[in-house]
């Protein structure tokens, strides 16, 4: 309830377009049932939810402490996981008009969509919350351009379309 009130204050009171969220909240994934009212409220407000991982919450923290891997790989893996959670957890099915943008071009999510589809086909748990293959939801999301290379950007555009890509920057 407090998160809904704060989002409403930000959007209606302050004139902001939405909110930036971490890819995990207090150790819980975003497909937890208790977050659905928040998503429904954001959808009703037309608010944009921008997901950007925080390195300290990286699920691979112990394995990415060297070589700057927490930033170069850890955060993009978090991006891909939040894409999968929002899709497979049924959030995008329950809120088809929800405006969600994923940092770093969604990490490797676009590249891995075929694997998510195959996993969905062969796993009853994966099919529980969504009636269609995961790839059919990927164009409901927006992705920023902080992908690291022109080739990655071109691949992402080919997968989701230019109308789902927004300018991004890791610099203020």
Describe these PLM feature segments.
Residues 5:
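Catalytic cores of alpha/beta
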Residues 1:
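Active-site mouth loops of central-metabolism enzymes
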């Amino acid at each position: 309830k407090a998160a809904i009130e704060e989002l409403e204050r930000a959007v209606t009171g302050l004139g902001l377009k939405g909110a930036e969220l971490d890819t995990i909240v207090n150790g819980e994934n975003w497909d937890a049932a208790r977050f659905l009212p928040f998503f429904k409220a954001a959808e009703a407000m037309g608010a944009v939810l921008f997901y950007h991982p925080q390195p300290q919450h990286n699920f691979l923290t112990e394995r990415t402490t060297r070589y700057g891997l927490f930033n170069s790989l850890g955060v993009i893996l978090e991006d891909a996981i939040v894409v999968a959670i929002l899709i497979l957890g049924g959030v995008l099915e329950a809120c088809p008009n929800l405006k969600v943008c994923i940092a770093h071009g969604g990490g490797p999510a676009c590249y891995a969509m075929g694997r998510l589809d195959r996993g969905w086909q062969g796993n009853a748990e994966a099919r529980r919350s969504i009636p269609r293959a995961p790839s059919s939801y990927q164009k409901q999301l927006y992705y920023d351009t902080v992908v690291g290379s022109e080739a990655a950007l071109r691949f992402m555009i080919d997968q989701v379309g230019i109308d789902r890509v927004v300018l991004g920057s890791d610099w203020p």
